[in-house]
Amino acid sequence: MQRYLFYSATSDIWKVERLKLPADYHVKIWVPKILSMAPRELMSSTFFVWWLFHWLKVFKNPCYKIYLVYTKDKLLAHYTVLLPAHFRFPFMHRSDLQIGPVGTNERHRRQGLAHYVINSILKEHENTTVRLWYVTRKENEASKKLIEGANFSKIGE
């Protein structure tokens, strides 16, 4: 059985850094549109369901988006999903957001891409009262190090 850790922080606690994306990469932010269910590289039933959740207002707020990091050759190197509160985690309040899932192509790991994107999300919400959540598998040391470095606290298991 997989064990998960739950982390959380608010803008008065999390740490925003001045980070620079490596020169060979650029970020695009995807938002749901009627005829765009997911970025083409991420088309799957999971992303289709989230697209439906957005349009059917299952998500408790309209902030669903996906941060995409591309190489100069237009290949997807990394993605981070920002999910609004919904029934899966009933403890989340209406304005809360979950960072994740997060995925980095193996060839692009250790470039600071996840760190950069998560920092961008923190910066985007630094003057708000939103609570951000992060869920990771207990054995995922890199993921735990990433979010603990942003001053998120482990809330539960």
List the model feature ranges, each with a label.
Residues M1-L52:
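Acyl-donor-binding surface of acyltransferase catalytic domains
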Residues Y4-Y7, S153-E157:
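Conserved catalytic-core motifs of GNAT/GCN5-like acyltransferases
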Residues S45-V102:
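A conserved beta-strand-loop-helix scaffold within acyl/acetyltransferase catalytic domains
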Residues P101-T104, R110-E124, K145, G149:
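Conserved acetyl-CoA-binding loop-helix of GNAT-fold acetyltransferases
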Residues N105, R137:
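Residue-level recognition of the GNAT/N-acetyltransferase active site
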Residues H125-T136:
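Conserved GNAT acetyl-CoA-binding A-motif
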Residues K138-G156:
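Conserved active-site alpha-helix within GNAT-family acetyltransferase domains
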